[in-house]
Amino acid sequence: VLTAEDKKLIQQTWGKLGGAEEEIGAEALWRMFHAYPPTKTYFPHFDLSQGSDQIRGHGKKVVAALGNAIKNLDNLSQALSELSNLHAYNLRVDPVNFKFLSQCLQVTLATRLGKEYSPEVHSAVDKFMSAVAAVLAEKYR
């Protein structure tokens, strides 16, 4: 459960991305494809090279969805409902992949934010991403 302090830290951290959302999303995806190669199977039509237009485009979508979730921290299920349906029923993405993306996004944030990615921020972002993964996996039951 996200505390009021967690929510504040998440919103502040997201605000520090300053227009680099597309790059952050693309880097997180690229990291995921390399750290967890089986995730590539969901993107057979993508150019998976670093910085490709497809990775950048999908990274932008991922970060936009997370931004929407951050605006709706008190109602993640509603904010992510369409995305949950898409991944469960149409794309049939194995829910473990949401955790992989979470880990890679956190590494990306840590490398970009440096000391600003404090243990407290890390904890809040980890809780948030776990909550997002849980909501995205809800429709699988």
From Swiss-Prot:
Keywords: Heme, Iron, Metal-binding, Oxygen transport, Transport
InterPro entries: Globin, Globin-like_sf, Globin/Proto, Hemoglobin_a-typ, Hemoglobin_oxygen_transport, Hemoglobin_pi
Domain Globin: 1-141
Gene Ontology CC terms: blood microparticle; haptoglobin-hemoglobin complex; hemoglobin complex
UniProt record, GO biological process: hydrogen peroxide catabolic process
Chain sites annotated for binding heme b: H58, H87
Chain's role: Involved in oxygen transport from the lung to the various peripheral tissues.
Assigned protein family: Belongs to the globin family.
Protein name, UniProt field: Hemoglobin subunit alpha-D
Protein's gene: HBAD
